[in-house]
Amino acid sequence: MPVSEAFAKLCVNEKPPAESAVAVKSLVFKPKTPKSATPVPIVVVALQSTTTPSALIANATSSKDPRLARDDLVKQAFQSESARAFILGDLANATSNFHLLIDHELGTVDGDTILQLNDSTYMKKSDMMKFLNNFEDSQKVVDFSQEVSKETATEGKKQQKKQQPSKAGTAAAAAAAALEDAKLIGITVDKALDFPGWYQQILTKGEMLDYYDVSGCYILRPPSYAIWENIQKWFDDKIKAIGVQNAYFPMFVSSRVLEKEKDHVEGFAPEVAWVTRAGSSELEEPIAIRPTSETVMYPYYAKWVQSYRDLPLKLNQWNSVVRWEFKHPQPFLRTREFLWQEGHTAHLTAKDAEEEVLQILDFYAGVYEELLAVPVVKGRKTEKEKFAGGDFTTTCEGYIPQTGRGIQGATSHHLGQNFSKMFNLSVENPLGSDHPKIFAYQNSWGLSTRVIGVMVMIHSDNKGLVIPPRVSQFQSVVIPVGITKKTSEEQRKHIHETARSVESRLKKVGIRAFGDYNDNYTPGWKFSQYELKGIPIRIELGPKDIEKNQVVVVRRNDSKKYVVSFDELEARIPEILEEMQGDLFKKAKELFDTHRVIVNEWSGFVPALNKKNVILAPWCGVMECEEDIKESSAKKDDGEEFEEDDKAPSMGAKSLCIPFDQPVLNEGQKCIKCERIAVNYCMFGRSY
């Protein structure tokens, strides 16, 4: 359904009583730009009672002097009749990029509250947020109450010009400015009230990523890329230990090769990006950018494998892939380009191949549980959900407590002989030439940067990121404290030298540590900054600590404090980091275990789903029944169906996996949805 039609469908048909509706304004601003540049309009959605200062709008969008837009810009950008007639539904008609600023105070309004968008348009708050999430790449939640008056800022600039402050005055002014800025630096959205807005802020303010000017593509900043590097190192060591080698294949695929395996390509066809031109010339044959590499690699496997002695062939590549066609990009979870590893192996026997599939799945579970402190359920995908062209797919499934949705973590596929027959990857039978040749048994398996998004969603809080110590770019920050105006230069130097010594000692035992020795910022500001960035522990060191030969250690996840003597630094700090790692996993596992429930009767299925649970239900194994479960669980009690986008989080419960760890299935147990006999318990849930 087009987004414009979706907006109309979400509107309330009958006008509610005036006293029950909350007024909301939608304003379009135009930033000041050079005459040669095209202005990017700024749309502000706020409570009618909220003041929206232009200075804060400029700050939130990194623009200059935004002013209310005139009719010509609004007509051009959103095809609206005029600026006065602009309504949120016009966002669906946008002809170019725009900024969307959402008032933080809207998060305090209950989801069922009716909002008045203009004289004749009304909508539930939850439905308005659902509509605005169509433009997630453009949106940002802003706390307009934090604005500093323009007059004060202007007067401050005048005073700076009039007098040259002393060195001490400069430091004090810098510290004061930093504390004032901290209001805007911190997270301004409650995780429980506006999860999408919180997720966006925590990634950008925590410096995990930045938005790129191509929709659905993101810049991985050093903290997030370091997490990916730590995962790479751990997983690379694991797969090399079982004989896998790294290689690299080109990112381009000819249409002829890509279309050779139709069943496989069909699942990716809408998402394939094509190169059709080189400069001003049309290419004779369009070239695809790989969505995955089976069809890229397997012709060469067939070329290189000349004898059964060449098997197994086990290659992995660390690369990026492009999958283009979807409407709801989400950083890390669903992006148009993403980093991953993809392993492709060929074996002489099905037994060897199937054993490797499960071994790799254990490695993937290790990435989540041992590195990221994220619990997962291992299982097998249904026939409907398995990898196109494969015999069977195994998976690690996670759970996002805030939304109650499952999320696919990583998959390991057994392809059988389907691809080897297609690409003629065959060898002579070891039993002799009088036996038929053998087509290789193949596997493919992949893990992507999605893991980072899952980790952030599960562990982080309203203070900022919470990053497990084993994958964090830095595991500890050393912060000198207790330095005041009365502290002599000699004392200050001694505190810093002692702090640097602590930092150095930690590095020597493999702790990823750094120190912040900038005296222009207060310790309190630094504490907030490193909590926002998710540094696992901070180590405080002041004059009194030095006298006692100790440091104070504070954990990021729960602010638990430890006093550690200098003599125990090398032994105790690693222990504290491991304790934190374990506590993060324990907390996440308790939540997942609590919200993974067994339901045997259909009458309890949707109520359990609506309590943010994933469900273990007896199932017959029939695909039509699986589809019926998803369709039926997507309906409201009044029979109205939720609108769904295939790539958006599903409202109906889809099959997540058939867990390897099965509850006891009683003899004669019926399927939860039909009258057939159940063959196993399947895990169902709303999902990403």
UniProtKB/Swiss-Prot annotation:
Entry EC no(s): 6.1.1.15
Full protein name: Putative proline--tRNA ligase YHR020W
Family, as annotated: Belongs to the class-II aminoacyl-tRNA synthetase family.
Species of origin: Saccharomyces cerevisiae (strain ATCC 204508 / S288c) (Baker's yeast)
PROSITE patterns: AA_TRNA_LIGASE_II (PS50862)
One example of a Gene Ontology biological process annotation: prolyl-tRNA aminoacylation
Domain of life of the source: Eukaryota
Keyword Aminoacyl-tRNA synthetase: yes
Modified residues (Phosphoserine): S149, S655
Span list, region Disordered: 631-650
Gene Ontology terms for molecular function: aminoacyl-tRNA deacylase activity; ATP binding; proline-tRNA ligase activity
Entry keyword set: Aminoacyl-tRNA synthetase, ATP-binding, Ligase, Nucleotide-binding, Phosphoprotein, Protein biosynthesis
Known catalytic reactions: tRNA(Pro) + L-proline + ATP = L-prolyl-tRNA(Pro) + AMP + diphosphate
Any Pfam family: ProRS-C_1
Residues bearing the modification Phosphothreonine: T170
